[in-house]
Regions:
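Beta-strand/loop edge motif enriched in small/polar residues
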Residues: 1-201
Length: 202
């Protein structure tokens, strides 16, 4: 069974996957319950496959999302989809040279454009060059970043490709292809490619 909760007005759940009609389905292909904001609180592995991500999906503090090599995640344009790892959360996206993990637009090939969806945001507890704790991340979502743990670990990004991201939530406040905020040295970043972003790649 899915275990639900809330943080303020935002629903939380220990499962990520649903059907198109928002039905709970541990083998579904839609990431998120269809709400604009959704907090994942748990540990889950996305098996190799193709998924549609809807809305702003937060990987909450203490939660771990693992994505298998060869997986394709398409960001929904209507809901400005974005995957946001909060401080204390982890994303284990460990692709391979022959089976990278791809985040891309849900638009048909030939119709994809920069800014079709949000992007990836990774927030940690390390010090930042602003010297500010709990600093608001660029781009619009609620998440803050910054602490004093320079060895903080936000997970693994290896052989990951991000395409057509950078939706402008507000004027001049686009998400980068991948946004890093106060990410610590315990995080593994290796062989990343960002293409056709509407804002900065990183």
């Amino acid at each position: 069974p899915y275990v639900w909760g809330a943080e303020g007005a935002i629903k939380t759940c220990d499962h990520l996957l649903f059907d198109d009609d928002k039905t709970e389905n541990a083998k579904g292909t839609v990431i998120g319950n269809g709400d604009q904001e959704f907090i994942f609180k748990g540990t889950q592995t996305l098996s190799k496959g193709t998924y549609l991500m809807k809305g702003w999906i937060y990987v909450g503090t203490g939660s771990v999302l693992t994505i298998e090599p060869g997986t394709v995640i398409k960001g929904d344009k209507d809901t400005q989809a974005a995957l946001i790892v909060e401080p204390g959360g982890k994303l284990i996206a460990e692709g391979t040279k022959d089976a990278p993990i791809v985040f891309t637009s849900e638009q048909p090939k030939g119709q994809r454009k920069p800014g079709d969806w949000g992007g990836l945001i990774i927030c940690g507890n390390a010090k930042n060059n602003q010297g500010v704790l709990n600093q608001q991340i660029e781009g619009g979502p609620r998440t803050k970043h910054g602490g004093n743990d320079d060895a903080d670990n936000s997970g693994i990004l290896r052989y990951v490709r991000v395409e057509f991201a950078g939706y402008p939530f507000q004027k001049d406040k686009e998400i980068n292809g991948i946004t890093f905020g106060s990410v610590g040295s315990g995080t593994t970043i290796d062989h990343l490619q960002v293409s056709y972003s509407n804002d900065d790649s990183y």
